[in-house]
Swiss-Prot record:
Name assigned to this protein: Bifunctional protein FolD
Keyword DNA-binding attributed: no
MF GO annotations: methenyltetrahydrofolate cyclohydrolase activity; methylenetetrahydrofolate dehydrogenase (NADP+) activity
Reactions performed catalytically: (6R)-5,10-methylene-5,6,7,8-tetrahydrofolate + NADP(+) = (6R)-5,10-methenyltetrahydrofolate + NADPH; (6R)-5,10-methenyltetrahydrofolate + H2O = (6R)-10-formyltetrahydrofolate + H(+)
Self-association state and partner proteins as the record states: Homodimer.
Keywords: Amino-acid biosynthesis, Histidine biosynthesis, Hydrolase, Methionine biosynthesis, Multifunctional enzyme, NADP, One-carbon metabolism, Oxidoreductase, Purine biosynthesis
Ligand binding (NADP(+)): G175, V176, S177, I243
Pathway terms, separated by semicolons: One-carbon metabolism; tetrahydrofolate interconversion
Database matches in Gene3D superfamilies: Leucine Dehydrogenase, chain A, domain 1, NAD(P)-binding Rossmann-like Domain
GO cellular component entries: cytosol
Length: 303
């Protein structure tokens, strides 16, 4: 039998991603300080931004600030929108060969390049701190430590800050993107959950039933209010990855927050939930890549 979640209180407790991310960053700064005190190189992160998309610029600025906070040296590559795939490939080759660079971040989406997979696969897997390279996703599928996709790994960290067990729970993931939904399923399988994944071909009645059965609900689609809060199981943990700007300027998630907060035990706010954890986890991956640099077979181990 699968353990059921406890009954909800009158309102959910917020999983404050900003606070938890700050705690993680403080610990990472201590790790960088210890590296430097031991005479090791400062971790280096190459941040590549193509074009001037406002949302991408905000994300990159947040990542650069986090790098500065923990003592990672950020190498900025702000490129014009007309940058070609061939030019990006040449830059990636250069960064792969640079010993000062331990992590490479290519901010997505890339204007004029509808399929970035070729470029992602060109990154040295040992420097793929986003965790998107097929080799790193493969390590995760084999239950091995490695550079894991940042958002799912950050969500696992969030779950560890609740008073609820993860093992033995029913988990439903809505959304099956390569960067969030699919690796999230792998993370929760490794954690001992029974995992259901829902997507655009899932019939509406099956989607509703899967959400109502979820002790842990992760929604990552990018459609405001896709999941009515009334569907949330009493006592569930709700992780809302979606961030959507409404016509009135408000930022909302994919889950109806007000109703969900009256049923869930824990829920992430939007904004301030998953986003800060993604950035902090990117820094975590960068430091781990620096620690593993030059050590054959480092950074991979059975979980």
């Amino acid at each position: 039998m699968t353990a059921s979640a406890p009954a909800a209180s009158t309102s959910a407790r917020l999983l404050d991603g900003r606070r938890i991310a700050e705690e993680l960053l403080d610990g990472l700064k201590s790790r960088v300080d210890a590296r430097l005190a031991a005479g090791k190189a400062r971790p280096g992160l190459a941040v590549v931004l193509v074009g001037g998309d406002p949302a991408s610029s905000v994300y990159v600025r947040n990542k650069r600030r986090a790098a500065e906070k923990v003592g990672i040296e950020a190498f900025d590559y702000d490129l014009p929108q007309c940058t070609s795939e061939a030019e990006l490939a040449a830059l990636i080759d250069e960064l792969n060969a640079d010993p000062k660079i331990h992590g490479i971040l290519i901010q997505l989406p890339l204007p004029g390049i509808p399929d970035a997979n070729r470029l992602i696969q060109r990154i040295d897997p040992r420097k793929d701190v986003d965790g998107f390279h097929p080799q790193n996703v493969g390590h995760l599928a084999l239950r091995e430590f490695g550079l894991r996709p940042c958002t799912p790994r950050g969500i696992v960290t969030l779950l560890s800050h609740t008073d609820q067990p993860v093992r033995g729970r029913n988990a439903t993931i809505v959304g099956v993107s390569n960067h969030v939904g699919r690796p999230m399923g792998l993370e929760l399988l490794i954690a001992g959950c029974t995992v259901t994944s829902c997507h655009k071909f899932t019939p509406p009645d099956v989607l509703e039933a899967s959400v109502r059965n979820a002790d842990i609900l992760v929604v990552a689609v990018g459609r405001p209010g896709l999941i009515p809060g009334e569907w949330v199981k009493p006592g569930a943990v709700v992780i809302d990855v979606g961030i959507n700007r409404l016509d009135d300027g408000r930022l909302v998630g994919d889950v109806g927050f007000d109703a969900a907060a009256q049923r869930a035990a824990w829920i992430t706010p939007v904004p301030g939930g998953v986003g800060p954890m993604t950035v902090a986890t990117l820094m975590q991956n960068t430091i781990e890549a620096a620690d593993a640099a030059g050590i054959e077979g480092a950074g991979v181990g059975i979980r």
